[in-house]
Structures are given as structure tokens and as C-alpha cells.
Amino acid sequence: MKSTNAGLLMTMVLAATATGSEDPGRSEVRREGDRATMTWPAAPGESGRLTLDLRPGSPLFERIEILEDASGRAATLAERVEPSTFVVVGSRENPPPIPPEMSVFNVFFDNPAKRPHRAFASTFGGKTLRVLSEGRRGSVAIGPIEVGPFRGELVITTYAGARLVHVEAVVSTLEDRTAYLYDAGLIGREPIGRSLAWVDTEGEIHREPVAPDAPDRSEAVRHRAIVAESGGGSLACFPPPHQYFFPRDDTDNLKTAWHGRGHRGLAPGFGIGIGQHETGGGNFSPWVNAPPGTEQRLGVFYLLSREPAEGAIREALRFTHGDRFPELPGRKVFTSHWHMAFTVEAMRQKAEGIRPLPIPELVEVFKGLGVDAVHAAEFHGDGHPGDPGPIRLPELAAMFEECRRLSDEKLLMIPGEEANLYLGPREPGRNPGHWLAMFPKPVYWTMKRGPGQPFVENDPTYGTVYHVGDTEDMFKLLNQEHGLAWTAHPRIKSSNFAPDIYRDEDFFRGDSWLGAAWKAMPADLSRPRLGERGLDLLDDMSNWGARKILLGEVDTFKLARSHEVYGHMNVNYVRLDRLPRFDEGWQPILDALRAGRFFVTTGEVLIESATIGGSEAGQALKVGKGDRPEVRVELSWTFPLRYAEVVSGDGRGVYRERIDLSDTPPFGRRTLTFRPELEGRTWARFEVWDVATDGAFTQPAWIDRED
């Protein structure tokens, strides 16, 4: 569904005052005849050098080197290799029911792999070079290239202060209803490196000598990286950590690294790279959208290192904090919408006499990710949520007990469900949508209320039990037990019509309705932001006059140590002094969510503080005629940043004031101050995005007009 304010969107460029971050130096591009050289300061005392061969028929990358500045010695990490992109192209369908104005590309329930599809490899139609930028970022475009129905250029970018080479096939197609996935890597006539290495799913380094004639093979790797080792160092290959993974129901490790000869039966030589798979990860595998004419950016990173593979992987992991969400003082990491089915599994184990009950892998996984609090969504496809009580109440008791057992001072497991009943009008051809509920303590309730059955009764075993039979009951329960509810996966999946369909209902306008949830879905690599579907909804809800928020959700089934969890995640950094213990209840988390005292992030960009006119997200401020309140934001990041925006609205339109951050180095910290135009606005929020399309955003601050 399109944003209702799409026609009133205005974007301006805003100047900002910045403090912090050192100048790492300058990237340069030089051309001499049929060669071009990109050099840049890669790290203290080291420079990177990429030599491009522009002759037809020759591999584009003549040499990838890292230089020791003091001695001038160069270590060659790869030579005579072609940066190659492979696409698998299929078609897009969006099954009903969907709103008539909703794009066919706004879909999750699709399987292009079940329809005709075909794989293609990229080829150069020429090697015309354009220098796009020098300075903090050196960038060139070379082309034209073709990859199946896509046409465009290859864009290569280096970042001063980073050992990275960022390669993107920037391509578009005119074909309608195109869905695709892509692989990327380096292909050479001769093997790349002497040995290959990666981290296996148990966290151990796996190393094997290069077998020059070995056929193409995919590997299940941890951290998404594969490394080619040579005598002078290592070259790591990895994708954008989140953008690369289109949404799936499961986070199974689908072998995203490959090596060998004849990749997909299309590569003429030996290669290494990253890859996606047509199927797997649940019942639906929707691939990536390519609306006609949009510039899709099919990206991959190469990291240069003078060290063996362990050093290259360690450096690559700095960009994701080691695939961990780092601690921030005064905040706790909260994640929501996990269908892990741990309750029914624990009940099965008990019934089979297994004692003591084992600790499921999910506890280890969440602690390893740095997560403090997990909001579960149990009984979604298992259990008996529709049972009137005899079966459901014991299942609820088991969920509460299991959450208590798995919680400790470092991890809080919060019981919850994706209930999907009563809240939302049922109209022919329209799904009222899915929603999640969270109470501040264990609450027993059934989703059925029989004739003459009281709304609330005292059960000798379970104590207070609520019976819900309609919208009024559900709303009453949420208010009485101080619970919160919100729209799951709004404007997509089974919530295609939500929350728009009930935006004027009392329950939506009430304080117990939190808002909606955000996830990077669907995938479209032409967009500079993830999850625009949800971000547009946040702006729409704010313009509706409903002071609602957008929290991050994951919405996945199953969880295991071997999974690629980090790539599919986002989290909420909630302002809390300490993590509540299970038996204390977790009312402080609900209070912080309701007040908007949190920011959402993929993990690489952290908004350590943000105020507008001295007010934090969720708070109100007054803006008078001619006032330009100061926005002050403290940021830290890993990948170099691309831009930030102050997004605001006046009840009719959405306005964006952009701050260019292309001068930022990697691994930086900065305080931004600026004064956007907010006169006549009713709300404003802040968001920021990096070159890998990782990002973070605050909740709105509410503006009261002062005449």
C-alpha cells in the first residue's frame, strides 16, 4: 500500500555542524592509457591499490594490492580476476486479497522458484570509465554491463580509512514484474590464492588448499564471509550484512559462500564469492523486487589484509561488532516476534520423562547476539490457541514456566503471542490483519467466550482467567492488565489492509495500541533505506494524528546455533536502567515502548542520544512562529555513513531534510547539530543510513504549535 502522503513528499538538503571523527586521508583515481589505478589510505600505515585493466577481453582487476606505506612494499592479494555478478531472474506475483492500490511488488507470499526462471552471468559490452568521486571516497563507474535483462554499469568505491573495495552492479530492467536474486564474486583463469578459509557454523576456522580444478561448491559459513589466502595476505569477500538477505520465514544457513570452477555453470574459470539460493528458509522464498526502470545495486565487499584469514575475518567482523549488538549505557536490547515453539517442545520433553530439561540453543544464540530481552510469539502454527481453556490454559502455564526457566540476570524471556483475533473489522475480501500482544506479567486468557460465560473468573488452578469473545473484550483485557498490542508486518503478508482498515477504531486510537512493527520487507535493492514500507507507515500514522510508534520485529520461525540469524535481525535499544527479572514483571519495558523511549537499528549504526529542541523521541515540544529548534544527535557507526534525515509532517505532507554524511570514515563517532524547518509541523523524527544500507531511526517527537 502506498503511503497516503506520497504526493506531498518534500526533500531538502540540510547543513549540519559536526564534531568528532578524524580525517583518514584521500582516495585517488588515476588513468594512464588502458589502465586506471585507485589508491586510498586503508589503515594507519597501509594503503590499498586496485589496478584496472580497461582492455576488451581482459579481466578488469589486474591486481588487488595492499601496500606498506613506510617501505612501499606491496602484497598482491589477487590478480587478473573479473568482478562478476550472476542473477537468477523470475517473475513476481502478488496473490489476493490485496488493496487495489497496492503494488504487485509489495509481497511476501510468493515463490518465483516455482515458476520459470533462468540464470545469467554479467558481461562487459565495453569498458568506458567514469570517475564519480575522489576524496574521502573514490568511486568509478565502468560499463556498459549486461546481466540477463539488466543493463547498467559496474561501480567500484573505496573508502578512506577502510580496507574495503565496494563493488556494485548498478543495473536496471524494463521488464515488468521481475523478481530476482544475485551472486557476486571474483573469477580468474587461475585459482585465487593458495588456500581458502571461512568460519564454519560451529564457529571454527576451516581452511583448505585451493583445488584448481574443483567444481563450484557452496559452503555453510558463519559471518557470511569467505577468504582467499595468498603469500602476502588475505582477501575476504562478504555481502552487505542485512540488505543481502531477502525476507524468509526461517533463518536457516543456506550456504551463502561459494568457491570453485564453473559457478552456476556460467563462470569460465575459478572463483570465490557470495551466493543466494532459489528455495529454502520456509514455505515462501520471495526473492528481490526489480520494478521497471529502478537502479538495482547488487553489491559485495572485498576486504584487504596483510594477515592470514583469521585477521581478515576479524577485521570484517568489526563492521558488525562481531555479529553482536553492543551494550549502550542506560539501554537494553529488546527483540520481538519470534515463533520458536519452545513451549510445545518443553511439554513434549516433560511428557517423555526427560529430566532435567535441556536448555534450548535459542538461549545461547540470543546471549551471543547481545540481546537482553526477547518477546516470544508462541502458538503460531503449534499449540491450541483457539481452545476454550482445558488445553490452552496448561499450554499458557507451560509457556510462562519455560520463560521463567530460561530467564536469568542476563536474558529476559517475555511470553507473548501473535493472536490475530477480534481487533480489526472483517470485511469481504479483506483480512483484518495480524497483531501481537504483550502483557507486563503472565496473564491467563482464552480466545473464546461461551454463551453466558463471564469475561473474568477465578480458576482454582490458574487464578484470574479472562475469556475474550469480541473486540470489546480484547480491548478491555489489554486495558485492564496494562498490556500493549500492535500490528505485525503491516501492509504486507496477512496484514495487507492493516492498520489502515482500523485507523479510526477506538482500540487503535487507545493507549493500549502501540502502533506497528518494522522489518526489512519486501526487498528492493534500488532503495537507499531498508523497510520503507514500515517507515512510510510510521509517517502516515503520525500524520493521522495518532501518536503511535514503530518497533523492530524479526518474525521468524525456529532458531539454532547454525542459523544465519544476524543478517535477518534488527533490534530495539530501549531506555532502561536495568533489566527486570522475570518474577518482577517487565512493566518498565512496556512503559518505555509506550513512551517511544527507544530507537530501532540493524546494529551497525547506533543513535546514542537524539533530541529535538531538547525533547527526546516520544516527548512533546513547542515550536513557535519562526522557531528552528536545534536537533542534536550523537552517533557511532562501523561502515561509512551515507546520509541522515530529519523527517517531519504537518498532518498532510511528509518533509525530509537530508544531511550528507559522505565525508565520514569507518568506525566513527560524531555529534551532529542542525536546525531544520519545523514551523507548522506536528511531529519529527531522525534516521541515518550507511553505505551497506544498514541504519537506525528514532520514534517521533510530538510538536505542539505555539501561536
Regions found by a protein language model. Name each.
Residues 1-9:
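Bacterial N-terminal signal peptides that target proteins for export
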Residues 10-20, 397:
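Hydrophobic h-region of N-terminal signal peptides that target proteins for export
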Residues 29-32, 40-45, 53-292:
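Beta-strand/loop-rich accessory regions of lumenal/periplasmic or secreted enzymes
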Residues 455-565, 637-655, 674-682:
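Domain-core and long-helix interface of multi-subunit machines
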